[in-house]
Amino acid sequence: MAYRDQPLGELALSIPRASALFRKYNMDYCCGGKQTLARAAARKELDVEVIEAELAKLAEQPIEKDWRSAPLAEIIDHIIVRYHDRHREQLPELILQATKVERVHADKPSVPKGLTKYLTMLHEELSSHMMKEEQILFPMIKQGMGSQAMGPISVMESEHDEAGELLEVIKHTTNNVTPPPEACTTWKAMYNGINELIDDLMDHISLENNVLFPRALAGE
């Protein structure tokens, strides 16, 4: 099957572990989920046939849950428990670890200088963003008023873009989240946590941008 003309966001939702494959190739399937696989591969100078072959292999596995057809209220409840609550746990812990690593290893050239600041910015932005979704947008959608929510949804999508840009800064600061040979246990644990956060946040944004918001605007 030819995947090259399909949007990244659609592929990430319909093929098991496609999101992990896109992450490996540093392809943006959440904020950039509307671009086709062919366009995304061309921008990264990647061989689209190789990626299509890998996707075909992944597509042989059954998908755990197809959120594209789930009720909107169920999607919202899942987003809050699986992503919002998880981000509220992840970020304070990562900020503590980054503070320690930047302090203890300040004299090392490989120290991720500024990481604490960027994680704190992400924490503040996401805390405000998730609260607005939970208090304003999600109740509107649950009440069947999603088609009238173009304004709030536009704001949320813009904030998703800002979060995506911060993730890129964090990846740059951490050498693409790769610990140096001299990294201590806390440093390595922190990078594992950052990788988990990036995966979670990209899946979270993808589910909202590519499923929840379009279906809500369509009047479901």
Swiss-Prot record:
It comes from the Bacteria. Its main location: cytoplasm. GO terms for cellular component: cytoplasm. GO terms for molecular function: metal ion binding. Keywords: Cytoplasm, Iron, Metal-binding, Stress response. One of its GO terms (biological process) is protein repair. The keyword Cytoplasm applies. It is found in: Cytoplasm. It holds the Pfam family ScdA_N. PANTHER family: IRON-SULFUR CLUSTER REPAIR PROTEIN YTFE (PTHR36438:SF1). Belongs to the RIC family. YtfE subfamily. HAMAP family: RIC_YtfE. Di-iron-containing protein involved in the repair of iron-sulfur clusters damaged by oxidative and nitrosative stress conditions. Homodimer. This is Iron-sulfur cluster repair protein YtfE. It comes from Shigella boydii serotype 4 (strain Sb227). The gene is ytfE.
